[in-house]
Amino acid sequence: MAIVVFANFRIHERLIVAGNAAETARNIVAHERLFRIGIACGLIYCTGLVILLTALYVILKPVNRGLASLAAFWRLVYALMWVLMTLNLFEARRLLSGADYLRVFEADRLQTLARLYLGARFDQYYVGLLFYALASTVCSYLWLKSNYLPRALAVFGVISSVFCAACTFVFIIFPDFARVVNLWWFDSPMGIFEMALSFWLLFKGLRPSGIAEADGLSIRQRNPDLR
């Protein structure tokens, strides 16, 4: 998450000027290395998402294999949305590269097309966020069922994830909904849950669970040599 905050607020916000395609293009060309660092941050984040969904699947599979698989799939969709967002950055930079085959287009047209690719990231993010919130809802439910975490933390995860999914879905249909509920509030509660979960797992670890113990007992019963 920290790498995304860095890329968005220290790089993209500095280079991308709202409502000014020409200024945005000049910033990207003048600070190409910084722009490419932002691209690299996106790729690192995508890699982290895949590692995380794999780890969560392994942890939550004993609780309910089907739901754990569904959550992993939805998180994968979210990761793919981030891949598309990163590819859009590449395409925007290519349009501003000054290559010979682009000289048939006017400069302002190329700048507008580049800004279009950058703007498309907004839509892709919120489509991906819907799937991420759905995945988080399922994972939070599995945390609740597993007793791996304190019940209050798992319940907060379910509520915040459902809230994010509902807000995002309504926003996709009714864009003016952002005037009622600020876009920052869509995923902020869920982000707080994710951070609390991370700190809990880092410092406390997983609680012993009857589900995990039963799963281990079942394995030993099937494999007597492991006793």
Task: Walk through the language-model features, giving the residues of each.
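Hydrophobic, aromatic-enriched alpha-helical segments typical of multi-pass transmembrane helices
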Residues: M1-R227
